[in-house]
Regions:
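Patatin-like phospholipase
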Residues: 1-371
Length: 371
């Protein structure tokens, strides 16, 4: 199929807290539907649409980001759907043939609470790192995101190659940058910092990357460990789950175009402490749109939102879409003010003023949502 005949689909997997099973279920169903569609086209069956639709980018935050990495690890293998269970025992039975189900439903056992409340992590770390024992996250990540597990490097027809996958991170140190004013002296410079961070991967590419996309190959193992750590970092819900340390090559971080205005990081390796990526960017659809615009050469929103001309669209999968806030109730009590303050900081951190006008228009062809 000619490149300009491809319709590019970008998946945005929103933060899901404990509803990762919803996101994983939608993704599992979508992949199965695309697989069946491909088979029907190959067999030239009647009444089958012939469009060439491919998933070209997957971006996610928190549980959505974790699901995105897990999904990227299974695309080169046969994805076996889980038969609809008829009893609770069947629902929680181990389903290793389907990692999306394995990650969010049967997990590591029928009852996860004893693992999360176990205090062995305190004895091991000699300190409290979170309210819950986060070791189960490590066990799941090691079980589901493995190096050299895929012998087949080919993608199915509904996946664009090379597929791009990215996660949002909340970088606790942040990236400093200087705001210069005329008359500034070296002793009186004005510095700020941003804490948005991204782990960006491009699957199955051997080329030397000139942009922010780190090569990721589950067949050779290249950068699989980095992807696994990034997946745990984007899902590190603060206080309840421990923060995560992520090491990346400095040159890979300095190539991230969405952070070009910050000061370049120094040294050969950049090590960060991170918490849940959804804190600052829970629905990173603006980055998904950036990637789609590059692939289609359609940077004009009037073109990519026009159903007569668009060559791509964003599919936002969001278990908890935001609702209109209730009327604010004045309450100057200490605890209420603290809750208001946290809500204010998170809300402002997630705000995307530059794209608010288009995000509220339900008639646009360039974006859809499953919630």
């Amino acid at each position: 199929m000619e490149e300009n005949k491809i319709f590019h689909l970008g998946l945005c997997l929103a933060g899901s807290v404990s509803a990762g099973s919803y996101t994983a279920g939608v993704l599992d169903y979508l992949l199965d539907a695309l697989k069946i569609w491909e088979e029907r086209k190959r067999q030239n069956l009647p009444d089958t649409p012939t469009q060439d639709v491919r998933i070209s980018v997957i971006g996610g935050a928190s549980g959505g980001g974790m699901t995105g990495i897990i999904a990227s690890s299974i695309l080169q293998n046969e994805i076996i759907p889980v038969k609809f269970p008829t009893s609770l025992k069947e629902i929680l039975a181990d389903q290793p043939q389907n990692k999306l189900y394995n990650a969010w439903v049967d997990m590591l056992g029928e009852d996860m609470f004893p693992m999360m409340l176990d205090t062995a992590d305190i004895d091991k770390n000699k300190e409290i790192t979170s309210l819950l024992n986060s070791d189960f996250i490590d066990k799941l990540a090691n079980k589901l995101v493995k190096a050299k597990e895929n012998k087949n490097r080919n993608f199915p027809g509904y996946i664009y190659s090379p597929l791009k996958v990215f996660l949002t991170l909340t970088n606790l140190a942040g990236f400093p940058y200087e705001i210069s004013y005329r008359g500034n002296t070296t002793l009186n410079k004005y510095y700020m910092a941003v804490h948005n961070d991204y782990a960006c991967f491009k699957l199955n590419t051997d080329e030397a990357e000139k942009d922010e996309w780190m090569p990721l190959d589950f067949a050779t193992g290249k950068n699989v460990e980095t992807a696994r750590l990034a997946a745990m970092a984007t899902g590190a819900f603060p206080i309840f789950l421990k923060s995560r340390v992520l090491a990346r090559e400095t040159r890979e971080v300095n190539k991230i175009r969405w952070l070009k205005y910050v000061d370049p990081v120094q040294g050969n390796e950049y090590v960060t402490q991170n918490i849940d990526g959804g804190i600052l960017n829970n629905e990173p659809f603006e980055i998904v749109r950036f990637v789609l615009n590059e692939l289609t050469s359609q940077p004009d929103s009037t073109i990519y939102n026009d159903p007569d001309f668009f060559k791509s669209t964003i599919l936002l999968i969001d278990p908890f879409p935001s609702e209109k806030p209730a009327d604010f109730k004045i309450d100057t009590g200490f605890l209420k003010t603290l809750a208001y303050t946290i809500n204010c900081l998170v809300g402002q951190g997630r705000a995307k003023p530059g794209i608010l006008a288009s995000s509220v228009n339900i008639d646009l062809a360039g974006q859809f949502m499953i919630a």
